[in-house]
A protein has these predicted regions:
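Hydrophobic structural segments
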Residues: 1-161
Length: 161
């Protein structure tokens, strides 16, 4: 499952292709929706690869950070070789950590591909699962479920999200 998004940010009519967004801006927005503090203790969420100061004009959304996704990110939104600026995945690339990331390793290949093309990689996993209007809510909505409650209340809002 994947989709793409183009961020135009606040632009003028004369400047429609320039982005006013940065990787850091996207990270801050994701933090408001899916706070890292709400992730499970074993989870690894946040910026994996990239520079928070880099501009963002397009984002590739995907479930997993695989080699195929990295190659699609390099190919870009129109496949013309103008890469996406950022990839946001649900599942983390380095859940258990890594001591070495050679290009011959699947995860090392993903990291190398993204770094060579200056593409940021960010993920939101269990923090997106538990968020109000997050992954679980979206799935419940698609399935038509009503009167849902969290399995493990974790928040302080009225619905304990």
């Amino acid at each position: 499952m994947q989709s793409s998004s183009h961020l135009n940010g606040p632009t003028t009519a004369a400047d429609t292709s320039a982005s006013k967004w940065t990787v850091g801006d996207v990270m801050a927005l994701m933090e408001t929706w899916y706070p890292a503090a709400t992730a499970q203790s074993w989870d690894r969420v946040g910026l994996i690869v990239g520079d928070p100061a880099s501009p963002v004009r397009s984002i590739l959304l995907a479930l997993d950070p695989t080699a195929a996704i990295a190659q699609q990110a390099v190919a870009g939104p129109s496949g013309d070789g103008q890469p996406y600026d950022m990839v946001i995945t649900h599942h983390p690339l380095l859940l258990r950590g890594a001591s070495f990331l050679p290009v011959t390793d699947p995860k090392g290949g993903v990291v190398t591909t993204l770094i060579r093309s200056d593409i940021a990689l960010f993920n939101a996993h269990t923090n997106a699962d538990v968020a109000c209007d997050g992954v679980a809510t979206a799935l419940a909505d698609v399935l038509g479920l009503r009167d849902t409650v969290p399995l493990e209340p974790c928040g302080t809002d009225a619905e304990r999200h």
